[in-house]
From Swiss-Prot:
Name listed for the protein in its UniProt record: Pheromone-binding protein Gp-9
Signal peptide segment: 1-19
Keywords: Behavior, Disulfide bond, Pheromone response, Pheromone-binding, Secreted, Signal, Transport
GO cellular component: extracellular space
Cellular compartment(s): Secreted
Disulfide partners: C37-C77, C73-C129, C118-C138
Keyword Cell division found: no
Family affiliation: Belongs to the PBP/GOBP family.
Function comment: Colony queen number, a major feature of social organization, is associated with worker genotype for Gp-9. Colonies are headed by either a single reproductive queen (monogyne form) or multiple queens (polygyne form). Differences in worker Gp-9 genotypes between social forms may cause differences in workers' abilities to recognize queens and regulate their numbers.
SUPFAM superfamilies (alphabetical): Insect pheromone/odorant-binding proteins
Length: 153
């Protein structure tokens, strides 16, 4: 069974690194629990943000707060089903392990540093849905910046 980056990468999370190249793809759609989680939250695939929309930050300006929250709940659902979150709490070590497996990142890789920074940035958020979306958005944005800087080099 596939697990998160995006899981952010999904982590989504955070393991969305490979998927982040396909900006039209729906966030988390490549993971086994995607359909289950959107159904559990009464959404359809059309309701879910695209990877490009989240990595660029456009999801924050193009959508209402309720849409943001619902998308975050779907992400949190996938993270929880993959054992990466329990409620609003991350399993940071498992999150890193899964991210490394998904992305092939090695110790010292800037993507791992970005994941750590994003987990630190969101660790005190209490709402599990908002926390999940902010985490994944942070990781995807960092991956986009790192990809742009490596392409420019």
């Amino acid at each position: 069974m596939k697990t998160f980056v995006l899981h952010i990468f999904i982590f989504a999370f955070v393991a969305f690194a490979s998927a982040s190249r396909d900006s039209a793809k729906k966030i988390g759609s490549q993971y086994d629990n995607f359909e289950t989680c959107i159904t559990e939250h009464g959404l359809t695939e059309d309701d879910i943000f695209s990877i490009g929309e989240v990595s660029s930050g456009n999801h924050k300006t193009n959508h209402e707060d309720t849409e943001l929250h619902k998308n975050g709940c779907v992400i949190q659902c996938m993270l929880e089903k993959d054992g990466l979150m329990s409620g609003a709490d991350y399993d940071e070590e498992k999150m890193r392990e899964d991210y490394i497996k998904e992305t092939g990142a090695q110790p010292g890789d800037q993507r791992i540093e970005a994941l750590n920074a994003c987990m630190h940035e969101t660790k005190d958020m209490e709402d599990k849905c908002d926390k999940s979306l902010v985490l994944v958005a942070c990781v995807l944005a960092a991956e986009a910046v790192l990809a742009d800087s490596s392409e420019a080099a």
